[in-house]
Amino acid sequence: MSRSLKKNPFVANNLLLKIHKLNTREEKEIIVTWSRASTIIPTMIGHTIAIHNGKEHLPVYVTDRMVGHKLGEFAPTLTFQGHARNDSKFRR
């Protein structure tokens, strides 16, 4: 279910402050965050945000097509190991 249009999109306060500081200084540096639930807003465009995937921080460059999506969508948490084998030689 999507968020109500009456509410503003969720963005973590510390992440929002970091982006506003970089925008006022007109600097570009990697922003490290654990907030995967934050929504990408237009002020984030052009920044590189390192999103935590549970093990490490993955750098993601924010473009205009990402606006409205969550940060966690761009940092996968699971690695696919392959389907289970049914062959008898792979069993013990």
UniProtKB/Swiss-Prot annotation:
Keywords: Chloroplast, Plastid, Ribonucleoprotein, Ribosomal protein, RNA-binding, rRNA-binding. GO terms for biological process: ribosomal small subunit assembly; translation. One of its GO terms (molecular function) is rRNA binding. One of its GO terms (cellular component) is mitochondrial small ribosomal subunit. InterPro entries: Ribosomal_uS19, Ribosomal_uS19_bac-type, Ribosomal_uS19_CS, Ribosomal_uS19_SF. It comes from the Eukaryota. It is found in: Plastid, Chloroplast. Protein S19 forms a complex with S13 that binds strongly to the 16S ribosomal RNA. Belongs to the universal ribosomal protein uS19 family. This is Small ribosomal subunit protein uS19c.
